[in-house]
Amino acid sequence: MNENLFTSFTTPVILGLPLVTLIVLFPSLLFPTSNRLVSNRFVTLQQWMLQLVSKQMMSIHNSKGQTWTLMLMSLILFIGSTNLLGLLPHSFTPTTQLSMNLGMAIPLWAGAVITGFRNKTKASLAHFLPQGTPTPLIPMLVIIETISLFIQPMALAVRLTANITAGHLLIHLIGGATLALMSISTTTALITFTILILLTILEFAVAMIQAYVFTLLVSLYLHDNT
Amino acid sequence: MASVVPLKEKKLLEVKLGELPSWILMRDFTPSGIAGAFQRGYYRYYNKYVNVKKGSIAGLSMVLAAYVFLNYCRSYKELKHERLRKYH
């Protein structure tokens, strides 16, 4: 049971070949493109959803920030679809791997911060000191703000990893508990099953929310820096 | 009237059972051939189930069901030990 719990998080390798590449590339199959004005239902639904999300997310940015639209929209689609696909039985979720989330968070955060430093150096440096701080506190506050700046990519990555991993672990554990309880006491098993259903609903929500939060935070870092 | 269609151009359902090995060996196994096969398969599925006037949830669900099945096959080795048996 102990070893079983975490084997579902190991990267899938078949005969030494990285199967994980295929799994990471799979969500792209589910988003077909269409050049038509009136396309099929599937593509129309996706385009409508994408327009909704992009309007809501990119409206706060100026024209320089809006050049990042493609990046942020593909980010939210990728994280959302990968998380939702991970809720299917037996599937592997790439976003449970810290390496992958770091690979997404660090370049995006660094891009936003470096853009800010290159184009608006004074304003970016001014972010380190909130307005209206008493003079004796200034050195300490600059240090604290620097630390909080450098912790941003780590927080982005670890937040996503921890949330998705914890959710999957809880589902495994409670599902196992329901199965084990069925032969002992059916009522308790039913209660546990209800908990499992609620948890699954929560996981669906978390899958989408985490994608949203990740993208929102990157866009906030961008907004600060453009 | 004896118009013999060469083996290479016959479709799979027209190939006789005895000719099957040679038909398989004649297929195009170059990288571009394999890529072409995947592309043809993808568009066959897409145009039959998704790119239609009244597409339903079945087009997407069949893909997800196949994904679940493939993942089950992939992790069968670990799942073998979780069967309800007295002796594993």
From Swiss-Prot, chain B:
UniProt modified residues of type N-acetylalanine: A2
Q: Which GO terms describe its cellular component?
A: mitochondrial inner membrane; mitochondrion; proton-transporting ATP synthase complex
Q: Where found?
A: Mitochondrion; Mitochondrion inner membrane
Q: Which InterPro entries match?
A: F1F0-ATPsyn_F_prd (IPR019344)
Tell me which residues bear N6-acetyllysine: K16
Q: What is its main location?
A: mitochondrion
Its membrane topology: Single-pass membrane protein
Its BP terms in the Gene Ontology are: proton motive force-driven mitochondrial ATP synthesis; proton transmembrane transport
Keywords in alphabetical order: Acetylation, ATP synthesis, CF(0), Hydrogen ion transport, Ion transport, Membrane, Mitochondrion, Mitochondrion inner membrane, Phosphoprotein, Transmembrane, Transmembrane helix, Transport
Q: Which residues cross the membrane?
A: 62-79
Residues with Phosphoserine modification: S3
Q: What PANTHER family does the record tag this protein with?
A: ATP SYNTHASE F CHAIN, MITOCHONDRIAL-RELATED, ATP SYNTHASE SUBUNIT F, MITOCHONDRIAL
Question: What's its job?
Answer: Subunit f, of the mitochondrial membrane ATP synthase complex (F(1)F(0) ATP synthase or Complex V) that produces ATP from ADP in the presence of a proton gradient across the membrane which is generated by electron transport complexes of the respiratory chain. ATP synthase complex consist of a soluble F(1) head domain - the catalytic core - and a membrane F(1) domain - the membrane proton channel. These two domains are linked by a central stalk rotating inside the F(1) region and a stationary peripheral stalk.
| Family statement | Belongs to the ATPase F chain family.
Subunit comment = Component of the ATP synthase complex composed at least of ATP5F1A/subunit alpha, ATP5F1B/subunit beta, ATP5MC1/subunit c (homooctomer), MT-ATP6/subunit a, MT-ATP8/subunit 8, ATP5ME/subunit e, ATP5MF/subunit f, ATP5MG/subunit g, ATP5MK/subunit k, ATP5MJ/subunit j, ATP5F1C/subunit gamma, ATP5F1D/subunit delta, ATP5F1E/subunit epsilon, ATP5PF/subunit F6, ATP5PB/subunit b, ATP5PD/subunit d, ATP5PO/subunit OSCP.
Q: What is this protein called?
A: ATP synthase F(0) complex subunit f, mitochondrial
Q: Native species of this protein?
A: Bos taurus
User: What is the gene name?
Assistant: ATP5MF
